[in-house]
Amino acid sequence: MPQRQPQPAHPVDGIYFGLMSGTSMDGVDGVAVRFEAGRAPVVLAEAFVGFAQSLRDALFALQQPGDNEIDRESLAANALVARYAVCCHELQRTAGLSRDEIRAIGVHGQTVRHRPERGYTRQLNNPALLAELTQVDVIADFRSRDVAAGGHGAPLAPAFHATVFGAPGETRVVCNLGGISNITILPGADGDVRGFDCGPANALIDAWATRHLGKPYDDGGKFAARGTVQASLLGALLDEPYFTAPPPKSTGRDLFNPAWLDARLAAFPQVAPEDVQATLTALTAVSVAREIAQHAPGCKAVFVCGGGARNPVLLDALRHALREAGVPATVDTTAALGVPPQQVEALAFAWLAYRFTARQPGNLATVTGAAGNRVLGALYPR
């Protein structure tokens, strides 16, 4: 007689996978995590699966309008999902899980357009194919529901940050330094959690390193460390109206891309490449620090996640910029709170899948500007 499998204490408790490929477009981060109501999430495995240069080129090309987009987009989505499936299989192998033990996969997809002011955001994905390749339920398309409610569809991580990183009596900021920088302000007392995109981070830093070093990123910030911040160039970059726009706001490669940078560099032909890199690093730090100074002046601690957490030159620049802005905050990575920085974004999308399964809201309207909190995502059954 077959034995009944033990049921979770809460009907949606269990093991979820989270997959995130961000605006740096270098690969996909994945986590396998156990969620139980009233308990901290437990990470069972993590994995990173890189993208081949051919896939990266296809993704970068889709950032800008071009010919035959529908065909190119569909083929790129299938190639992308093939890498997602590899990541899922690696998580399953590392954690020693059968597919029946996995409640669902929460997958963000790859943003190729983000234009909430026009009523849409587009994440490249083929969740039906991922469900077929993994034989696990897939939950995807998290951002569009928030946009449909009048929100920016971003950032979505603040609700997760509040659950995991908040501390009573202490104002904290969680700063994600991915392709784009964003912050979550955790008030530590009565008050709304807030969050928004600050501006470019690795999107421009990596692009400049690729152009001048032939490498996908500035390893440890060494290229920037060879240069000197050019105050006049930094001022010209900071003249971009986005930096002074009030929240809620979100941005991406639609605005902050190499063409945006080149248009401003045209007035500074004498600036050496390493000085441009130093200035781009300062741009990231200053744009974040100014937003913290304006919206969380009492912040005592900033915790960094994302790829920028591995760049000590950028972290030092952020510390300097915060001091200059009059913010007496320490800067550390989320590892100090028990979550390695490379796991945070993927964890957030596993959590969003968990919330969807419980039919609980995943956004914060105070962050995105939506008409209200909404259940985010769509289910693709295995």
Swiss-Prot record:
GO terms for molecular function: ATP binding; kinase activity; phosphotransferase activity, alcohol group as acceptor. InterPro entries: Anhydro_N_Ac-Mur_kinase, ATPase_NBD. CDD domains: ASKHA_NBD_ANMK. It comes from the Bacteria. It catalyses: 1,6-anhydro-N-acetyl-beta-muramate + ATP + H2O = N-acetyl-D-muramate 6-phosphate + ADP + H(+). This is Anhydro-N-acetylmuramic acid kinase. Catalyzes the specific phosphorylation of 1,6-anhydro-N-acetylmuramic acid (anhMurNAc) with the simultaneous cleavage of the 1,6-anhydro ring, generating MurNAc-6-P. Is required for the utilization of anhMurNAc either imported from the medium or derived from its own cell wall murein, and thus plays a role in cell wall recycling. Its EC number is 2.7.1.170. GO terms for biological process: 1,6-anhydro-N-acetyl-beta-muramic acid catabolic process; amino sugar metabolic process; peptidoglycan turnover. Gene3D superfamilies: 3.30.420.40. Transmembrane segments: none annotated. The gene is anmK. ATP binds at residues 22-29. Keywords: ATP-binding, Carbohydrate metabolism, Kinase, Nucleotide-binding, Transferase. Pathway: Amino-sugar metabolism; 1,6-anhydro-N-acetylmuramate degradation; Cell wall biogenesis; peptidoglycan recycling. PANTHER family: ANHYDRO-N-ACETYLMURAMIC ACID KINASE. Belongs to the anhydro-N-acetylmuramic acid kinase family.
